[in-house]
């Protein structure tokens, strides 16, 4: 099963909301981390997912965005108090490291919760971790001997090769082989990633000197690897203006590739939205561009598994 990990921001939630009615519930389970105090969009998304037989994992002790400086106490109760989200999600507890006893102790109050490990954990916590419904971890940050002793593991990675500037993207980058390699361990039941957004939390994007469109794909001739094509604008790249013109330039490059290689990308909801945008040369805004890329990424992986 695929576990896309997203922040509870507008476009990430829109992505999950729109995909809920078209993706098979048996293929994916989103992991959502609240990052602001606006709960209505999150609640609506939980409800939409549940209506389509998906129970997302929702981090109930978030630590990013609004919650980097504000307490998340009461978040679970707030979501349970609303009939649109009550009992429609799985609480997920974020554990920073082996010293995070506060987070580990939460599991006693939420016995069916999942655990999300940000880094390494000690052998002394194994019994606690194995009482969780599942444990999400990054194999590059957790001792393999610990991983092997856990019962129900979901491995995730921060796979998107994010650049500081859009101008620094090459035409293609390797993403991950986790969609295949996760099956090698018998105690691993799924894999996850941060789509094309990356693990780092950013409140908003910077000025658009260059507009980039990121399109994920699994090549049928090399299905063990996922890659990402990056279509970048070059016009007015010294000025943070003309985002619409820059987007259209990148979009033309994208569809020139598609015309020459019509079977490389899956026909997804996200790709159909890019196609509709291309048909009328409409710039929907940079947030929606990322949204379309996220939709395409998630659906492509669901199609594969």
What is each of the regions a protein language model found here?
Residues 11, 34-39, 62-68, 95-102, ...:
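Short acidic, S/G/P-rich loop/turn micro-motifs used as interaction or catalytic elements
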Residues 16-21, 40-53:
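Histidine-anchored nucleotide/phosphate-binding helix
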Residues 30:
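Conserved, mostly hydrophobic/aromatic
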Residues 48-111:
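A broadly used, surface-exposed interaction patch
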Residues 83-84, 114-130, 134, 145-148:
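Extended alpha-solenoid helical-repeat scaffolds
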Residues 130-271:
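Long, charge-rich C-terminal accessory regions
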Residues 259-305:
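Hydrophobic, glycine-enriched assembly/anchoring segments
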């Amino acid at each position: 099963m695929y576990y896309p990990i997203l922040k509870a921001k507008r476009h990430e939630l829109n992505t999950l909301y729109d995909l809920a009615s078209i993706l098979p519930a048996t293929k994916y389970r989103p992991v959502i981390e609240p990052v602001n105090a606006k709960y209505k969009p999150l609640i609506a998304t939980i409800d939409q997912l549940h209506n389509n037989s998906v129970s997302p994992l929702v981090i109930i002790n978030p630590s990013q965005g609004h919650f980097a400086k504000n307490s998340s106490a009461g978040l679970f109760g707030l979501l349970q108090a609303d009939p649109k989200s009550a009992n429609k999600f799985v609480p997920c507890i974020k554990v920073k490291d082996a010293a995070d006893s506060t987070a580990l102790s939460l599991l006693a109050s939420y016995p069916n919760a999942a655990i999300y490990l940000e880094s390494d954990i000690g052998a002394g916590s194994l019994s606690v971790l194995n009482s969780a419904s599942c444990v999400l971890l990054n194999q590059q940050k957790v001792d393999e001997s610990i991983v092997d002793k856990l019962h129900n593991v979901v491995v995730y990675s921060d796979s998107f090769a994010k650049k500081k500037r859009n101008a620094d993207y090459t035409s293609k980058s390797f993403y991950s082989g986790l969609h295949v390699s996760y099956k090698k361990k018998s105690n691993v039941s799924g894999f996850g990633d941060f789509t094309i957004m990356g693990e780092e939390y950013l409140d908003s994007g910077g000025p658009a000197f260059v507009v980039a469109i990121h399109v994920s794909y699994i090549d049928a001739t090399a299905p063990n690897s996922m890659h990402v094509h990056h279509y970048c604008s070059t016009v007015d790249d010294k000025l943070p203006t003309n985002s619409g013109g820059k987007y259209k330039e990148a979009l033309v490059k994208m569809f020139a590739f598609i015309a020459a290689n019509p079977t490389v990308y899956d026909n997804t909801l996200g790709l159909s939205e890019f196609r509709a945008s291309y048909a009328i040369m409409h710039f929907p805004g940079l947030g929606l561009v990322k949204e379309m890329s996220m939709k395409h990424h998630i659906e492509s992986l669901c199609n594969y598994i």
